[in-house]
């Protein structure tokens, strides 16, 4: 999944703001109808709910993640990714600004 840029896409101008601005992203729309979000999460402990299944690709920074139903935390950093099932949730702890791409499945 390591791609440095996305070509021939449309970007939604309005930012997605979550958790009082602790997570900020922009939606990228692809010609085949798929979408991704490019964003940052500032230092915080947050819980995200998912509708669609997601793959979170980490571009920069580090985080700890706990998927719904698990007691175990997993650490992720730049160049790594984790998957979240649809209609689920995950907890994320960020100590330094996290740069990510969310791939919706």
Curated annotation (Swiss-Prot):
The keyword Nucleotide-binding does not apply. The keyword Transferase applies. Belongs to the nucleoside phosphorylase PpnP family. This is Pyrimidine/purine nucleoside phosphorylase. Keywords: Glycosyltransferase, Transferase. HAMAP family: Nucleos_phosphorylase_PpnP. Its EC number is 2.4.2.1, 2.4.2.2. It comes from Cupriavidus taiwanensis (strain DSM 17343 / BCRC 17206 / CCUG 44338 / CIP 107171 / LMG 19424 / R1) (Ralstonia taiwanensis (strain LMG 19424)). It holds the Pfam family Ppnp. The gene is ppnP. It catalyses: a purine D-ribonucleoside + phosphate = a purine nucleobase + alpha-D-ribose 1-phosphate; adenosine + phosphate = alpha-D-ribose 1-phosphate + adenine; cytidine + phosphate = cytosine + alpha-D-ribose 1-phosphate; guanosine + phosphate = alpha-D-ribose 1-phosphate + guanine. GO terms for cellular component: cytosol. Signal peptide: none annotated. It comes from the Bacteria. One of its GO terms (molecular function) is uridine phosphorylase activity. Catalyzes the phosphorolysis of diverse nucleosides, yielding D-ribose 1-phosphate and the respective free bases. Can use uridine, adenosine, guanosine, cytidine, thymidine, inosine and xanthosine as substrates. Also catalyzes the reverse reactions.
């Amino acid at each position: 999944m390591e791609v440095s840029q996305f070509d021939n896409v449309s970007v939604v101008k309005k930012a997605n703001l979550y958790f009082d601005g602790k997570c900020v992203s922009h939606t990228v729309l692809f010609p085949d109808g798929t979408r991704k979000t490019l964003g940052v999460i500032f230092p915080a402990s947050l819980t995200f709910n998912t509708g669609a299944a997601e793959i979170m690709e980490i571009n920069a920074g580090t985080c700890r993640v706990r998927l719904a139903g698990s007691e175990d935390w997993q650490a992720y950093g730049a160049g790594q990714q984790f998957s979240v099932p649809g209609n689920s949730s995950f907890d994320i702890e960020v100590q330094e600004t996290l740069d990510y791409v969310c791939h919706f499945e």
